[in-house]
């Protein structure tokens, strides 16, 4: 069954997320459930519009050590249908959207699901953030 599109995949905010995601090694975009998803090969690291109520939002996987702080920040929400102990959602269309923070969180999410080869390739691009 084909799902209806929830958000215009060419919306400028989605394009901004796309640019960050596709700059990561071997990242691909796959439309699933009528929404753009970004994957490190197969595992999803960013899901656009995971909630029907929030079409201009993304859901991403967090670092376990940072998760609690993010959930206490009013800009983030616990997304439905996701493990709320590891995933958070954030609205993209808010005036206080911090795009630098989102880029860092997207990279963290990618690192959570990427395989060793992909993480090594990212470490070459960003040695200051290497997993040491």
Locate each region found by the language model.
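Charge-dense, helix-prone N-terminal extensions
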Residues: 1-132
């Amino acid at each position: 069954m084909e799902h209806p599109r929830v958000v215009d995949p060419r919306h400028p905010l989605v394009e901004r997320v796309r640019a960050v995601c596709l700059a990561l090694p071997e990242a691909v975009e796959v439309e699933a459930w009528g929404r753009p998803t970004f994957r490190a090969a197969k595992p999803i690291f960013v899901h656009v519009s995971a909630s029907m109520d929030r079409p201009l939002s993304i859901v991403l996987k967090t670092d376990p050590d940072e998760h609690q702080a993010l959930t206490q920040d009013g800009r983030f929400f616990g997304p439905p249908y996701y493990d709320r102990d590891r995933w958070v959602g954030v609205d993209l269309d808010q005036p206080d959207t911090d795009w630098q923070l989102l880029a860092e969180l997207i990279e963290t999410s990618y690192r959570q699901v990427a395989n060793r080869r992909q993480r090594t390739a990212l470490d070459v691009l960003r040695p200051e953030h290497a997993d040491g």
